[in-house]
């Protein structure tokens, strides 16, 4: 027989798998877009060109496997969330983050089906990516909470210590700003504006090219990315007073600082590579990791729903 600890570890491991699955779905979504495979299965869903298997074309294969892996990852996400809910009535964080994951898995799947019939709609495609990020963050945060339930000293107990109100407001403001910037970047990509600014850091040889047409879209994204880099570059200074009391936030701050530096570098590589697919995948991977890192920091600024969770079966019937 397996004990409560073994069951909790099994749940956490499967949640790890489900979280990685949603990460892969996000990457496949962008691969689908940048290989022009969105209509590889025609304007049909869930069928692919009238059948249940794809044709021989590369675009059909990419779109088919994007749909298939999305379906498997979505089902696995539902399974682990329901499993976690049945195992843990408390703390509230398990139920809340699980609910966020389920809601946005459903929403992004619905938008994905709509996108089949409107693949040229940049706002819909950007929303599709944004909701996928929210689903990924919800499941990723539930995964982190499950780890903290097994070992509260890994982060749960730090949340009881409090922190400077200014740091909390700063982190949440940066999180919301980052979400808006990610949406804008996705919108720019789906508008086909990625190469409107040739070269980096200059735009078509100009430091300030002005705001005209597609050039304005990508230039605004660059300015927004620069602002995010400055905001996160200042985060260690804002968090300096809480460094000793909140090592979780301090370490997280350094991680997101590295991630945003890599993200800006990957953006430069993307432009200089003329939107190579591998550069695009790197850019999307880093922004997804950065989003989860910022979401973790934001959650760690909030007090826990209960003082100290008990490892094992917490509040389950």
Residue spans for each PLM region:
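Polytopic transmembrane helical bundles with strong interfacial aromatic enrichment
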Residues: 1-317
């Amino acid at each position: 027989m397996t004990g409560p600890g073994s069951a909790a570890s099994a749940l956490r491991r499967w949640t790890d798998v489900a979280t990685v699955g949603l990460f892969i779905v996000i990457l496949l979504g962008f691969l689908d877009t940048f290989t022009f495979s969105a209509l590889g299965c025609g304007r049909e869903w869930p069928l692919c060109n009238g059948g249940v298997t794809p044709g021989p074309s590369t675009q059909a294969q990419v779109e088919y496997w994007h749909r298939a892996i999305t379906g498997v990852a979505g089902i696995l996400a539902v399974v682990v969330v329901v499993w976690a809910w049945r195992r843990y009535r408390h703390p509230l964080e398990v139920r809340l983050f699980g609910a966020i994951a389920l809601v946005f898995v459903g929403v992004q799947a619905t938008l994905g089906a709509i996108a089949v019939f409107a693949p040229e709609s940049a706002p819909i495609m950007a929303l599709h990516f944004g909701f996928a990020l929210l689903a990924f963050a919800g499941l990723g945060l539930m995964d982190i909470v499950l780890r903290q339930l097994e070992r509260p000293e890994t982060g749960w107990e730090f949340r009881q210590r409090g922190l400077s109100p200014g740091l909390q407001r700063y982190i949440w403001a940066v999180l919301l700003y980052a979400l808006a910037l990610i949406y804008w970047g996705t919108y720019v990509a789906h508008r086909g504006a990625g190469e409107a600014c040739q070269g980096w850091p200059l735009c078509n040889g100009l430091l300030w090219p002005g705001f005209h047409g597609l050039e304005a879209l990508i230039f605004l994204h660059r300015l927004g990315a620069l602002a995010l880099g400055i905001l996160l570059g200042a985060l260690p200074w804002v968090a300096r007073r809480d460094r000793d009391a909140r090592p979780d936030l301090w370490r997280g701050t350094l991680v997101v600082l590295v991630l945003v530096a890599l993200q800006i570098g990957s953006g430069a590589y993307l432009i200089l590579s003329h939107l190579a697919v591998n550069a695009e995948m790197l850019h999307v991977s880093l922004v997804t990791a950065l989003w989860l890192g910022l979401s973790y920091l934001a959650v760690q600024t909030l007090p826990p729903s209960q003082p100290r969770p008990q490892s094992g079966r917490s509040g389950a019937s």
